[in-house]
Amino acid sequence: MKIAIVGAGVIGVTTAYELARDGHEVTVFERNSAIAVESSFANAGVISPGYVAPWAAPGMPLKVFKHLFSRHAPVKIKFPLNNDDLTWMWYWWRACKLDTYIANRSRMQALASYSRDRLHAITADASLEFERSEGYMVLLRSAKDSAMVQPNLQVLRETGVPFKEISASEARLIEPALNPDNDFYGAVHMPSDEVGNCREFTLLLKSESQRLGVKYELNTNVAGVFYDKFAIVNIANKDTSLFFDAVVMCAGVHSAALLKPLLKPLKRKLPLIPVYGYSISAGVREPLNAPRSALMDERYKVAISRLGNRVRVAGSAVIGGKHDNSPENRNTQAISTLYKVLHDWFPGAAHISNMGASVHEWQGARPMLPDGPPVIGPSGVPNIWLNLGHGSSGWALSCGSARVLADMVAHRKPDIDASGFNIERFS
């Protein structure tokens, strides 16, 4: 089939690759001048299937409220909240029920595990190298932090994910550069998890997909997607309609506006909003003082990753405010938390003294759905497919989501149960 993909982040490019492998003629439309320059650009890079879980969890609304005015809170609400934000929060609150959380967590972790397998298969088949390292450690500042992670660890036991609870001294053997002056409680080590450079992988996979015949139309802003005997893509500022057998929407937060005219007659809703995350990236100052792989500060939900000759610190989630990804809209408190966490654990790891010259501060608009799992599958409109709403887990879920979508397009049964990824759950 002749298939169009809207969006060239990691979700769009992996989808293009899998569809091309199946023999389809694929064209990818991207509004920017390069691929992977939005949510895929500077994320933490962590791939930890056992730690992929919905934000909609029992007790989570109370936690967010309690930290509403905390400077270093992992989740921040920024006022004003528009109607889309309020609708999203209502769905989110409704999904915080225990049975809903357990079901969605199971779906996300199954997809994440499958996605890691697909990532390894693609990496081996195409001989890709993209700043990978193995191992992931969750740092626990106190006994209270340790108690808080026990429910998650029980899930890891039940699902067979290898991990070990270790003391601070054992953690220092794995990560010798941990700050000797930081007297922390302990850690959880997951040796089979990993970290990798999402954007570098996406760029490499773009080249592989082009070898399979995929075409990339950059600087091309899609104004609308329609169906009238064919799937139709309208290009902004051009009196042009392009016809395809199918269209796959992978445009992140921009998908909601493009899909609204299609979904409204069907009385279907897509409560997709941007939740802003942040990262700082800086060159390694002294390798002996830098992390070897990836770690997460459990209290602040901030990840510290080693990506080649750089250290990246990523975290925070800001809901609401002005939906604007410009530098002027950055949350300075969220960014200050990243510097604090880096200094607490690896004070001499990176060149951060001359911030303007050596530190890259990044804000990304994560395309978040309120209940956790992405939407993968048919939209309800003939020949219009969806692969979107992966939120902060896009990198961890990308390769699996792409394969599931490609199997659906081919009317094949996916390798995992994909029934929980449908759009009908928001009706």
Predicted regions mapped to residue ranges:
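N-terminal Rossmann-like FAD-binding beta1-loop-alpha1 element of flavoenzymes
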Residues: 2-28
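Glycine-rich FAD pyrophosphate-binding loop
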Residues: 21-41
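Central helical "cap/lid" subdomain
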Residues: 32-38, 236-291, 331
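Dinucleotide-binding Rossmann-like beta1-alpha1 core, especially the glycine-rich loop
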Residues: 42-168
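Short beta-strand to alpha-helix junction loop
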Residues: 103-116, 138-148, 188-207, 326-334, ...
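Active-site lid/adjacent beta-loop-alpha segment flanking the redox-cofactor pocket in flavoenzymes
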Residues: 125, 268-271, 275, 283-380
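Helical element adjacent to the flavin cofactor pocket in flavoenzyme catalytic cores
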Residues: 147-159, 181-241
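C-terminal catalytic lobe of FAD-dependent flavoproteins
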Residues: 163, 192, 298-299, 343-427
